[in-house]
Curated annotation (Swiss-Prot):
SUPFAM superfamilies from the UniProt entry: Nucleic acid-binding proteins
GO biological processes: translation
Top-rank taxon, per record: Archaea
GO cellular component annotations of the record: small ribosomal subunit
Organism expressing this protein natively: Methanococcus maripaludis (strain C5 / ATCC BAA-1333)
PANTHER family assigned: 30S RIBOSOMAL PROTEIN S12 FAMILY MEMBER
Family statement: Belongs to the universal ribosomal protein uS12 family.
Protein name according to UniProt: Small ribosomal subunit protein uS12
Function: With S4 and S5 plays an important role in translational accuracy. Located at the interface of the 30S and 50S subunits.
GO MF assignments: rRNA binding; structural constituent of ribosome
Length: 147
């Protein structure tokens, strides 16, 4: 803080510290961190995974320049009732997921917890359907349990 408004005396340390503390609140990243806003907005509430019930299947169009319909599901989380969209990874993975199934979701792995690749606004992916891993279902190593 070498500006003209900064105190420059021998005992100016405390004043400089208070000034720096006050200035930090003008930076949005500091505000988010100090007030833990990311955790408050997170549907999983800081947990790595979450269980939910499939509300509906949806197909989302990929962003330009790609052209595809990405198969996703709307999931209502059991812990807090919030609805999120989760991607169904793998060939024909959507066929193993039915409405009212219980699924486990986790973050999709995008930059700073955001969406990944060309799927707009989707931050989560389906990991398990019932007690079965979605990856194993797609590969044909497991069969979905019939009720």
């Amino acid at each position: 803080m070498a500006g003209s408004k900064s105190p420059k005396g021998e005992f100016a340390g405390r004043k400089l510290l208070l000034k720096r503390k006050a200035s930090r609140w003008h930076h949005y990243k500091y505000v988010n961190k100090a007030l833990s806003l990311k955790l408050k907005a997170d549907p999983l509430e800081g947990a790595p995974m979450g269980r939910g019930i499939v509300v509906e299947k949806v197909g989302l169009e990929a962003k330009q320049p790609n052209s595809a319909i990405r198969k996703c599901v709307r999931v209502q989380l059991i812990k807090n009732g919030r609805q999120v969209t989760a991607f169904a990874p793998g060939n024909h993975a959507i066929n193993f997921i039915d409405e009212h199934d219980e699924v486990v979701i986790e973050g999709i792995g995008g930059p700073s917890g955001q969406a990944k690749g060309d799927i707009p606004g989707v931050r989560y992916k389906v990991v398990m359907v019932g007690k079965n891993s979605i990856r194993e279902l797609v590969r044909g190593r497991q069969e979905k349990v019939k009720r």
